[in-house]
């Protein structure tokens, strides 16, 4: 949804746009920032880099793998057209979803207020649109 006019956003070359002409460009790292400049309270919103690094190490060690597999199985059985991971962090669950063959035709999206987290998610999950 467009943060300016609340119309639907569509994927366009280089980012996203709504029918009213509001455009949101994709950063070179592969994410799109939908937070309007006047609504930014801090350039460092969300988790600091060190917390993201620790979380990534913890998740990549497999501690939440059973949960991730159950989530993938549940969503694959539902056959959705798209999935939005709100608060996706660095994209751990999105990576699990993107790796599932049964979800290959599903549009995957991730959002997070932490600029560093969404940058990491976009870098680690290229088939996913990160906003």
Describe the function of each predicted region.
Residues 112-116:
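Conserved SAM/SAH-binding beta-strand->alpha-helix loop
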Residues 121:
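Conserved SAM-binding loop
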Residues 61-79:
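Conserved alpha-helix/loop element of class I SAM-dependent methyltransferases that forms part
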Residues 126-131:
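Conserved SAM-binding strand-loop segment of SAM-dependent methyltransferases
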Residues 48-67:
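Class I SAM-dependent methyltransferase Rossmann-like catalytic core
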Residues 1-44:
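N-terminal auxiliary segments of SAM/dcSAM-dependent transferases
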Residues 80-89:
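Conserved class I S-adenosyl-L-methionine
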Residues 90-103:
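Conserved SAM-binding loop of SAM-dependent methyltransferases across substrates and taxa
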């Amino acid at each position: 949804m467009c943060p300016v006019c609340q119309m639907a956003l569509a994927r366009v070359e280089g980012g996203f746009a709504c029918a009213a002409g509001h455009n949101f460009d994709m950063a070179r790292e592969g994410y799109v920032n939908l937070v309007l400049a006047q609504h930014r309270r801090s350039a460092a919103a969300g988790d600091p880099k060190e917390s993201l690094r620790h979380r990534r190490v913890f998740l990549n060690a497999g501690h939440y793998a059973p949960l991730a597999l159950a989530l993938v199985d549940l969503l694959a059985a539902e056959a959705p057209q798209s999935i939005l991971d709100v608060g996706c962090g660095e994209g751990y669950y999105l990576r699990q979803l993107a790796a599932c063959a049964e979800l290959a035709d599903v549009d995957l999206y991730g959002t997070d207020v932490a600029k560093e987290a969404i940058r990491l998610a976009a870098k680690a999950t290229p088939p996913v649109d990160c906003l």
